[in-house]
A protein has these predicted regions:
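Residue-level signal for well-ordered alpha-helical scaffold segments within enzymatic catalytic domains
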Residues: 6, 24, 53, 69-73, ...
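Conserved RNase H-like, two-metal-ion catalytic cores of nucleic-acid enzymes
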Residues: 1-55, 196-202, 211-231, 235, ...
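Acidic active-site catalytic centers that drive phospho-/nucleotidyl reactions
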Residues: 9-11, 67, 89, 149
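Polyanion-binding interface signature
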Residues: 169-265
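Active-site-proximal flexible loops/turns
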Residues: 16-18, 74, 96, 156
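Acidic, Mg2+-coordinating catalytic module of metal-dependent nucleases/exonucleases
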Residues: 110-174
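Conserved DEDDh/DEDDy metal-dependent 3′-5′ exonuclease domain
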Residues: 31-106, 259-281
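Short, well-structured alpha-helical interface segments that form or flank functional binding sites
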Residues: 20, 46, 66, 141, ...
Length: 281
């Protein structure tokens, strides 16, 4: 972790940012730990503005997209600040490499399975919040709950940093090695959008055959068109279809999505091949 990053944890009274509110924000930076508590709806705006002053120029590390989407909705409601968009979501990273090994990717289950940390159910923290709303005093239980939740996120971040060091792939750009991991995959109509997280900022805007590659900060995105078809049960014969013609699948075609499920090993090989072809020409 460096001085330009911050790990964030929030607790809310529900899942709808228009109806519910944030009552706790924890921020962990390289040299400080911040706690912001809201005892009622009226003080929510104050803690959000205070937290934003710390976060505005940093890369935010969050467990999932929920926290950032919730905060961004509140920023739009209360302020004219820019929304937070420089983020790393730990759940996305772990999904690509441990999805088949873990029965659940929920924070509570990951905390228990990976670190033997017990994160109480969210409903318990909401009950604790309702108590302090009446008493006007932050309870020790709520403070401990937030510390445990943040401790899990810090451990998961360090866990994935170690995983990056041990498992990252590499490609060469102008005699410099760039290390990366698969970060996110989205299927948008007949296109596949593949995001990589790297260990370095770079500027890339290139095309390789039908694949477009662009970079933004520490992220690289590959966008390619998918051919749709069907695969026999034994995966030996496959017919690819387009609007104009039908043709048989040849040996160097690899399925990337089957029945809506991403084939991660094939996607990783495609990324490796594409990057090598582009930058080693």
């Amino acid at each position: 972790m460096n001085e330009n990053q911050a790990i964030i944890n929030i607790e809310t009274t529900g899942i709808d940012p228009h109806k519910n509110h944030i009552y706790l924000i924890n921020i962990f930076t390289i040299d400080r730990y911040y706690n912001f508590y809201s005892k009622n709806n009226e003080s929510e705006e104050k803690i959000i503005k205070s937290a934003y002053k710390i976060l505005q120029n940093k890369q935010i590390i969050s467990f999932s997209e929920f926290d950032i989407k919730f905060i961004n909705t509140k920023l739009i409601i209360y302020t004219e600040f820019d929304v937070i968009n420089n983020c790393i979501y730990l759940q996305k990273l772990i999904r690509n490499y441990y999805n088949s090994q873990l029965s659940s990717l929920k924070a509570k289950d990951l905390a228990a399975n990976l670190f033997d940390i017990n994160i109480d159910d969210k409903s318990k923290s909401v009950k604790l919040y309702k108590k302090i709303s009446k008493s006007n005093r932050i309870s020790d239980e709520l403070i401990e709950f937030s510390k445990t939740s943040m401790n899990f996120k810090i451990k998961l971040y360090n866990y994935m940093r170690k995983f990056f060091e041990e498992n990252c792939a590499k490609f060469d750009v102008y005699s410099n090695f760039v290390r990366y991991l698969l970060y996110d995959i989205k299927k948008i109509k007949n296109n596949l959008e593949i995001s990589l997280i790297t260990d370095n900022k770079m500027e890339i805007d290139a095309m390789y055959e039908s694949t477009q590659i662009k970079s933004q900060g520490m992220f690289i995105t590959l966008c390619l068109s998918l051919h749709e078809g069907y695969i026999e049960d034994d995966f030996v014969e496959c017919t690819m279809t387009s609007m104009d013609n039908n043709y048989n699948l040849i040996n160097n075609y690899y399925p990337l999505v089957i029945n809506g499920e991403f084939i991660y090993d094939n996607i990783k090989e495609l990324v490796k091949y594409t990057l090598t072809e582009i930058f080693n020409e």
